[in-house]
A protein has these predicted regions:
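Adenine nucleotide-associated cytosolic modules
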Residues: 1-248
């Protein structure tokens, strides 16, 4: 690390759990973020600010006025441009040392497999079941840690799945692929700060995994009801009959 990096990351480096070694791991890390909306915006910004060396972000949407209430990587002048472009601009301004690979595309098929295999950690910041299950399956196949977040209304949740380690369950152990489609912000609404809270926790969990510090949310589902400010943690167990991790 050079002198500028030592100063930029000094408040993290002074933490004994992080230290120089942890910061070097962050600088060398490659993270994949799927979704540049309410969750992906804060997650990407905090990971870039913290010094994650390479961030690849996928999203196929353009910025709309209704996004600006909660998607903090996008601003009024960005309306009509690709979300990944406005996100890359924000991340580059926040920390020019970070390599940002922004792709306007729905991440599917062989490209999904390639990106998941190349990443150290994957953050699922999407809002539809089909994409979530596809990401989860790829993470199980390549044993890439997955940090999954969701927010709707006043509620949020985060879980971490580490395939192949500690008998970890996968996303499909928690949710059936035959279930109803996820509720989304467009049809049900969402209070703005809950997306920031959940996206920030996703970033924190990713950093913990990269630096191998603390206790991750592996095997737990963290739930927040922001109307009452009650946090709950549910233990998750691997399903031996899971159609994804039970057969791979």
């Amino acid at each position: 690390m050079n002198d500028n990096q030592l100063l930029r990351y000094s408040r993290q480096i002074m933490l004994p759990q992080c230290d120089i070694e942890g910061q070097q791991k962050l600088l060398a890390a490659k993270v994949l973020i799927v979704g540049a909306g309410g969750l992906g915006s804060p997650a990407a910004m905090y990971l870039a600010a913290a010094g994650v060396g390479s961030i690849t972000i996928y999203d196929d949407d353009k910025v709309e006025l209704s996004n600006l209430q909660r998607q903090i990587a996008h601003h009024t002048p960005d309306i009509g441009i690709d979300k990944v472009i406005s996100t890359r601009h924000v991340l580059n301004n926040l920390n020019p040392d970070v390599n940002v690979n922004a792709v306007k595309k729905r991440l599917l098929g062989e490209q999904l497999n390639f990106e998941v295999n190349a990443a150290e950690v994957v953050l699922d910041c999407t809002d539809n079941f089909a994409t979530r299950f596809a990401i989860n399956k790829a993470c199980v196949i390549y044993q890439t840690p997955l940090v999954s977040g969701a927010a709707i209304g006043f509620d949020g949740q985060v879980a971490v799945f580490t395939p192949g380690k500690n008998n970890s369950p996968c996303y499909n152990c928690l949710y059936s692929s035959e279930g109803d489609e996820l509720q989304n912000c467009a049809s049900n609404g969402v209070i703005a700060p809950i997306t920031g809270i959940i996206g920030s926790i996703q970033a924190l969990e990713a950093m913990k995994l990269i630096m191998s510090i603390g206790e991750s949310l592996t095997g737990r589902l963290l739930l927040l009801d922001s109307l009452t400010m009650e946090w709950n943690s549910m233990k998750l167990r691997k399903n031996p009959a899971c159609p994804t991790c039970g057969v791979i």
